[in-house]
Swiss-Prot record:
Recorded name of the encoding gene: SLC27A1
Cytoplasmic-side segments: 35-646
Binding site for AMP: Y246, I247, Y248, T249, S250, G251, T252, T253, G254, L255, P256, K257
Described purpose of this protein according to its UniProt entry: Mediates the import of long-chain fatty acids (LCFA) into the cell by facilitating their transport at the plasma membrane. Also functions as an acyl-CoA ligase catalyzing the ATP-dependent formation of fatty acyl-CoA using LCFA and very-long-chain fatty acids (VLCFA) as substrates, which prevents fatty acid efflux from cells and might drive more fatty acid uptake. May act directly as a bona fide transporter, or alternatively, in a cytoplasmic or membrane-associated multimeric protein complex to trap and draw fatty acids towards accumulation.
Notes on activation and inhibition: Inhibited by Triacsin C.
Major localization listed first in the record, in broad terms: membrane
Assigned EC number: 6.2.1.15, 6.2.1.3, 6.2.1.-
Residue ranges annotated as Extracellular topological domain: 1-13
Keyword DNA-binding on entry: no
Name of the protein described by the UniProt record: Long-chain fatty acid transport protein 1
């Protein structure tokens, strides 16, 4: 875009003509002619097409910044902000459990969280102490971390799918002095009890399973019934920059990391979602996402705690109950993540899916290939796709419904929100730098790593990192925008078009090179899944001895062993370039996913195409014969020895 140079030329021409004594109208017309002739027409086109979008985005940014500044100056925290909501509407429904039908008003949520605060203060816990929470999503989950926050304590929110080593690891790295777990988690806690420190105090909440209560465990619910529901007599001196709780990364590439969430980050994330998608106080939000992650607990529950919306919780997503729940509770906003939209499209068409009042679906991970199919089939007017990790400072949002886009950054005023796509080595993901040692910005259409400039004094740009200092340092680069600055490295590759819309490409490590070409796992997964009726698919690269690059491998869910590999190949030939067609197929009962419905590839990549590592059906694409062959140990040996041409 040549707007800066064109603008300078037009200003110079305007000054010269004015000095010559020509009327200002003639001078302005001549300057405009120079501007357009110098390439400025591109900038004018961008202004015309994006001004409305950018002005709305700017208004959201300003609004969130002003709200945050007001709360910071007043010394508020999330519990203090929630207290104001309770005083405004004590009897309005705050949380509804769709699984049990249990309803909590704002006054009841306030009383429960007060009981939690008073109890843990009486038990000797102090501000700054960490308490781990390990139970399924229900109103008590919110009341527990909110109550701990009222007492100045910090919750570590554990993924309920963790077991054995990962569970013990997360508990150990959290520094928790106590563990609150649900009755449904007794067996999981029992498995790691021998690895937990003797000083860890354990509390169990909810109905006990057949295992009964574990040794040295206190029943929490009776203790809470005896605790005072009045506000704490002494409110801890906390502010918006203090820690609220810890959320663990999904662990798709290894053991989870504890991301630090401060009060201002919680507020910022919830506020951006609220204003960017024009949520209203009368909205009812359906939240079937895990509460141990930010989408469910901040973007979703945050609308309740900060803005007073009613939030309907379901502890686990159910494709068959989704629209029935929305109809029953008059939901107007729903959340999605990962593959949820695809799972809904897999359901048989029925009348109920159009009788709802849902106008907005907010989330991330909606594949462009099914975007319009989802909106047309279910009658949802707006998709609020966004991009952003729990800890990142470069979140973006699609505010105007651009199909396939996960957000935008203004081309008119790019420095208002200092994020950027920068060039990287596509094999190593190493930052590429210019002669001055600065990162090289990508041009429109060029894929690059998303980075955000860090300013710890600005709540919109700060990066709080992880409990692990080494993990934090790995996410920071220096001299990115300017000499000596610091920037957050998202680890994600996006591409921006000429109008500033950004599109998610791949998480770093999810692209691989084969036959001199870059293969996008996201693209191949989308194509395969669509061909197979929205089946779960994981695509990744595997190393083959003596062969440059990585060969594509696709793991496909085939629980009833009905898929024909060669029928799949016939279809792939029509829609994928030769280098993108998977060389190896793995047909398995189900594809592993995380708690947020993201495909889990770590185990699959480790096992590769070695038939000794799995009992799943494996196939190899014989290019000479033009079809897939069963891959047994003999074929595996021949591939590794170079007998087959890849």
């Amino acid at each position: 875009m040549r707007a800066p140079g064109a603008g300078a030329a037009s200003v110079v021409s305007l000054a010269l003509l004015w000095l010559l004594g020509l009327p200002w109208t003639w001078s302005a017309a001549a300057a405009l002619g120079v501007y357009v002739g110098s390439g400025g027409w591109r900038f004018l086109r961008i202004v015309c097409k994006t001004a409305r979008r950018d002005l709305f985005g700017l208004s959201v940014l300003i609004r969130v910044r002003l709200e945050l500044r007001r709360h910071q100056r007043a010394g508020h925290t999330i519990p203090r902000i929630f207290q104001a909501v309770v005083q405004r509407q004590p009897e309005r429904l705050a949380l509804v459990d769709a699984g049990t039908g249990e309803c909590w008003t704002f006054a009841q949520l306030d009383a429960y969280s007060n009981a939690v605060a008073n109890l843990f203060r009486q038990l000797g816990f102090a501000p700054g102490d960490v308490v781990a929470i390990f139970l399924e999503g229900r109103p008590e989950f919110v009341g527990l971390w909110l109550g701990l926050a009222k007492a100045g304590m910090e919750a570590a929110l554990l993924n309920v799918n963790l077991r054995r080593e990962p569970l013990a690891f997360c508990l150990g790295t959290s520094g928790a002095k106590a563990l609150i777990f649900g009755g449904e988690m007794v067996a999981a806690v029992a498995e790691v009890s021998g690895h937990l420190g003797k000083s860890l105090i354990k509390f169990c909440s909810g109905d006990l399973g057949p295992e009964g209560i574990l040794p040295d465990t206190h029943l929490l619910d009776p203790l809470l019934k005896e605790a005072s529901t009045a506000p704490l007599a002494q409110i801890p001196s906390k502010g918006m920059d203090d820690r609220l709780f810890y959320i663990y990364t999904s662990g798709t590439t290894g053991l989870p990391k504890a991301a630090i969430v401060v009060h201002s980050r919680y507020y910022r994330m919830a506020a951006f979602g609220h204003h960017a998608y024009r949520m209203q106080a009368a909205d009812v939000l359906y939240d079937c996402l895990p509460l141990y992650h930010s989408a469910g607990n901040i973007i979703g529950v945050g609308q309740c705690l900060i803005y007073g919306l009613t939030v309907v919780l379901r502890k686990k997503f159910s494709a068959s109950r989704f629209w029935d729940d929305c109809i029953k509770y008059n939901c107007t906003v729903v959340q999605y993540i990962g593959e949820i939209c695809r799972y809904l499209l897999k359901q048989p068409v029925r009348e109920a899916e159009r009788r709802h009042r849902v106008r907005l679906a907010v989330g991330n991970g909606l594949r462009p290939a099914i975007w319009e199919e989802f909106t047309e089939r279910f009658g949802v007017r707006q998709i609020g796709e966004f991009y952003g990790a729990t800890e990142c400072n470069c979140s973006i949002a699609n505010m105007d419904g651009k199909v396939g886009s996960c957000g935008f950054n203004s081309r008119i005023l790019p420095h208002v929100y200092p994020i950027r796509l920068v060039k990287v080595n596509e094999d190593t993901m190493e930052l590429l730098r210019d002669a001055q040692g600065l990162c090289i910005p990508c041009q429109a259409g060029e894929p690059g790593l998303l980075v955000g400039q860090i300013n710890q004094q600005d709540p919109l740009r700060r990066f709080d990192g992880y409990v692990s200092e080494s993990a934090t340092s790995k996410k920071i680069a220096h001299s990115v925008f300017s000499k000596g600055d610091s920037a957050y490295l998202s680890g994600d590759v996006l591409v921006m078009d000429e109008l500033g819309y950004m599109y998610f490409r791949d998480r770093s490590g999810d692209t691989f090179r084969w036959r001199g070409e870059n293969v996008s796992t996201t693209e191949v997964e989308g194509v395969l899944s669509r061909l197979l009726g929205q089946t779960d698919v994981a695509v990744y690269g595997v190393a083959v001895p003596g062969v440059e690059g990585k060969a594509g491998m696709a793991a496909v869910a085939d629980p009833h062993s009905l898929l024909d590999p060669n029928a799949i190949y016939q279809e792939l030939q029509k829609v994928l370039a030769p280098y993108a067609r998977p060389i190896f197929l793995r047909l398995l009962p189900q594809v592993d996913t995380t708690g947020t419905f993201k495909i889990q590839k770590t185990r699959l990549q480790r096992e590769g195409f070695d038939p000794r590592q799995t009992s799943d059906r494996l196939f190899f694409l014989d290019l000479k014969q033009g079809h897939y062959l069963p891959l047994n140990e003999a074929v595996y040996t021949r591939i590794c020895s170079g007998a087959f041409a890849l």
